[in-house]
Amino acid sequence: MLEIDNQTPLESDFLLLEKIANVLAPTQIIELILVSGETMREINRDLRGCDYATDVLSFPLEAIPHTPLGSVVINVPLAQENALKLGHSLENEIALLFIHGVLHLLGYDHEKDKGEQRQKEGELIKAFNLPLSLIERTQD
């Protein structure tokens, strides 16, 4: 199940994100928070000590029954900028960021694993007919 806290003017039905959430965590609640660039910078600074706005952050919660899996925070203006630059829709960019964030909630870590997160993202991108993944775009 997906709970959305949209703190931006973005209007969407978020059906694609609901489908992704149901595939990745069919029995768990995922909180999605859509924020401005400034809010993302504040969150990143306050919680991670990094004083810049990033595109997506994930905050897993403890595995306590009946609580959300965690929160995925997406910087909507930066997602829009990247979508325009890469030539695909904002909806697709947010879906890519959401997949990336939820995989982190599920314990994947592309900075430490041996390609498992990259492989899982690839599978989901094919399943949902999305453009190049976040990890693929940032590979050298």
Swiss-Prot record:
<feature type="binding site">
    <location>
        <position position="110"/>
    </location>
    <ligand>
        <name>Zn(2+)</name>
    </ligand>
</feature>
<keyword id="KW-0862">Zinc</keyword>
<dbReference type="GO" id="GO:0005737">
    <property type="term" value="C:cytoplasm"/>
</dbReference>
<comment type="function">
    <text>Single strand-specific metallo-endoribonuclease involved in late-stage 70S ribosome quality control and in maturation of the 3' terminus of the 16S rRNA.</text>
</comment>
<keyword id="KW-0255">Endonuclease</keyword>
<comment type="similarity">
    <text>Belongs to the endoribonuclease YbeY family.</text>
</comment>
<keyword id="KW-0540">Nuclease</keyword>
<dbReference type="GO" id="GO:0008270">
    <property type="term" value="F:zinc ion binding"/>
</dbReference>
<feature type="binding site">
    <location>
        <position position="104"/>
    </location>
    <ligand>
        <name>Zn(2+)</name>
    </ligand>
</feature>
<dbReference type="GO" id="GO:0006364">
    <property type="term" value="P:rRNA processing"/>
</dbReference>
<dbReference type="GO" id="GO:0004521">
    <property type="term" value="F:RNA endonuclease activity"/>
</dbReference>
<keyword id="KW-0698">rRNA processing</keyword>
<dbReference type="InterPro" id="IPR002036">
    <property type="entry name" value="YbeY"/>
</dbReference>
<feature type="binding site">
    <location>
        <position position="100"/>
    </location>
    <ligand>
        <name>Zn(2+)</name>
    </ligand>
</feature>
<dbReference type="Pfam" id="PF02130">
    <property type="entry name" value="YbeY"/>
</dbReference>
<keyword id="KW-0378">Hydrolase</keyword>
<keyword id="KW-0690">Ribosome biogenesis</keyword>
<dbReference type="InterPro" id="IPR023091">
    <property type="entry name" value="MetalPrtase_cat_dom_sf_prd"/>
</dbReference>
<keyword id="KW-0963">Cytoplasm</keyword>
<dbReference type="InterPro" id="IPR020549">
    <property type="entry name" value="YbeY_CS"/>
</dbReference>
<protein>
    <recommendedName>
        <fullName>Endoribonuclease YbeY</fullName>
        <ecNumber>3.1.-.-</ecNumber>
    </recommendedName>
</protein>
<dbReference type="GO" id="GO:0004222">
    <property type="term" value="F:metalloendopeptidase activity"/>
</dbReference>
<keyword id="KW-0479">Metal-binding</keyword>
